[in-house]
């Protein structure tokens, strides 16, 4: 068979060793084997109903995470408009950090938006009957009026749709706003929340600009305790800066599992490839080895932990293997000296724009940085 370039992420994982499991397996496990067989046998010209759909209404977001960009965050776009482009980044071939990407959001909420109108027409006509899962991403979905419009539809049309609603959220809200969300979704038949974090305290707040870690952790607990959601999933974007406290962050997640149950919260470790200068692979080998050793110790300590799912342990193990065996984030990545130069260029400017201090927040990287 062939290896299309778009499949490179999974092949890098599977090439590490014969036991490595890539996302093409995890992304398929939500479907029964019968559905996968049916998809294999069905001609590509056939008219089929979608089973899952992921939609982004707009890019409105109060965060400006370091690994994000203006195409997905209005706060990032404001940074570029206010402070101008990031300069000196030779590996930013797609110009993620040079302009506000206004083409990513052509219409404001309330304006005539043919794309959103088409979605709601489709949803009302038959999608609400045939779709198994609708996942809303962003931006920050809870800052989009269209997300609340969809929640209102479910409340006003109870019993008409069995579609599972999955909502991405950074959970960066005060108690009043969080309670408003909880009460809004309580009548809905099936809601799951996906949230993101991959480090602890000041390091998490540095990476995910706009985050209050204490507030985030408290909101996670309130959501679980509310009983309004079926599950909460934590997506960890594995980048160069999170590794120093990732093991502690995983401890925090295990503590939640012990408190609320094995299935109340789950996590995945998703290895960052873009922007490639923020990949964990830009770190020098001695630092990678240090972090790899910490993860190995964490794995050994938790391998028989009753609260961990097999896929969670496998995600930790594949990250350990990735740090040991993979040398480049992807096939089009620049050579390592250029990526490391961009790393320093970016975070120097990031500190100036966001009022942060890399050396103070990541003292273990200071000598290398």
List the model feature ranges, each with a label:
Residues 1-109, 127-128, 315-369:
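N-terminal pre-core extensions flanking Radical SAM catalytic domains
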Residues 121-127, 152-158, 182-186:
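Leucine-rich repeat
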Residues 6, 119-122, 150, 216-219, ...:
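Alpha-helical packing segments of well-folded alpha/beta enzyme cores
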Residues 148-152, 176-184, 245-247:
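Distinct, well-ordered alpha-helical segments
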Residues 50-60, 71-115, 129-147, 157-177, ...:
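Core AdoMet radical
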Residues 116-119, 124-125, 283-285:
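General structural signal for secondary-structure boundaries
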Residues 58, 77-80, 185-188, 196-369:
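Radical SAM enzyme [4Fe-4S]-AdoMet core and its adjacent flexible, acidic
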């Amino acid at each position: 068979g062939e290896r299309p370039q778009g499949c490179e992420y999974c092949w890098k994982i599977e090439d590490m060793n014969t036991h490595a499991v890539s996302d093409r397996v995890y992304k398929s496990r939500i479907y029964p084997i019968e559905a996968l067989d049916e998809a294999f046998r069905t001609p590509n010209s056939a008219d089929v109903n979608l089973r899952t759909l992921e939609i982004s209404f707009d890019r409105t977001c109060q965060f400006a995470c370091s690994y994000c960009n203006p195409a997905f965050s209005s706060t990032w776009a404001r940074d570029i408009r206010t402070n101008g482009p990031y300069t000196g980044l030779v590996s930013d071939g797609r110009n993620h950090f040079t302009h506000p990407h206004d083409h990513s959001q052509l219409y404001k909420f309330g304006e005539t938006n043919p794309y959103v109108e088409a979605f709601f027409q489709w949803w009302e006509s038959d999608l609400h009957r045939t779709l198994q899962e609708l996942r809303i991403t962003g931006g920050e979905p809870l800052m989009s009026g269209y997300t609340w419009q969809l929640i209102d539809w479910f409340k006003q049309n109870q019993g008409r749709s069995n579609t599972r609603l999955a909502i991405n959220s950074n959970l960066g809200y005060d108690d009043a706003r969080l309670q408003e969300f909880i009460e809004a979704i309580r009548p809905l038949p099936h809601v799951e929340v996906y949230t993101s974090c991959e480090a602890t305290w000041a390091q998490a707040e540095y990476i995910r600009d706009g985050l209050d870690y204490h507030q985030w952790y408290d909101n996670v607990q309130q959501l679980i305790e509310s009983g309004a959601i079926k599950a909460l999933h934590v997506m960890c974007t594995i980048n160069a800066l999170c590794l120093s406290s990732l093991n502690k962050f995983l401890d925090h997640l295990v503590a939640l599992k012990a408190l609320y149950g094995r299935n109340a919260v789950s996590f995945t470790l998703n290895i960052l490839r873009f922007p490639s200068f923020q990949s964990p692979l830009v770190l020098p080998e001695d630092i990678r080895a240090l972090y790899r050793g910490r993860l190995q110790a964490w794995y050994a300590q938790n391998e028989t932990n009753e609260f961990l799912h097999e896929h969670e342990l496998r995600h930790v193990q594949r990250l350990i293997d990735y740090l040991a065996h993979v040398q480049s984030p992807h096939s089009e990545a620049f050579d390592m000296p250029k990526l490391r130069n961009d790393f320093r260029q970016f975070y120097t400017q990031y500190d100036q724009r966001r009022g942060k201090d890399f050396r103070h927040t990541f003292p273990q990287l200071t000598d290398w940085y």
